[in-house]
């Protein structure tokens, strides 16, 4: 469900001073001010290890490695979140475009955007996510 306003209250309330201490400048700008890291520079763009991608702000599990695919766009791409409850979608009118912004549904951190040009044999969606908004927890591959 997309929200048009920025008035949603998230369960995890962030302390700005603590976030500035804990996050890198890029992580802070991406998650708190909807900045975008440069294409092909993110830590997880080409990661293929098995595991879970979590919100860098509140550690909510967001995406599984099994949903990750190489889109060629320069940012980590996933065809679905871990489940329908972990992300919040908001209409974004910035930069003269209309897009759907993706946020962590627990803390409201900006993650990236979702587009309808993902793998047609999956969901048809491409969650284009900034590496700076994520932490990766590796897990052994299932046999």
UniProtKB/Swiss-Prot annotation:
Binds 1 zinc ion per subunit. The zinc ion is important for the structural integrity of the protein. This is Peptide methionine sulfoxide reductase MsrB. Keywords: Metal-binding, Oxidoreductase, Zinc. GO terms for molecular function: peptide-methionine (R)-S-oxide reductase activity; zinc ion binding. It is an enzyme of class 1 (oxidoreductase). It catalyses: L-methionyl-[protein] + [thioredoxin]-disulfide + H2O = L-methionyl-(R)-S-oxide-[protein] + [thioredoxin]-dithiol. It comes from Burkholderia ambifaria (strain MC40-6). The active site is at 128 (nucleophile). One of its GO terms (cellular component) is cytoplasm. Belongs to the MsrB Met sulfoxide reductase family. Zn(2+) binds at residues 55, 58, 104, 107. Residues 16-139 form the MsrB domain. GO terms for biological process: protein repair; response to oxidative stress. Its EC number is 1.8.4.12. Its cofactor is Zn(2+). PROSITE patterns: MSRB.
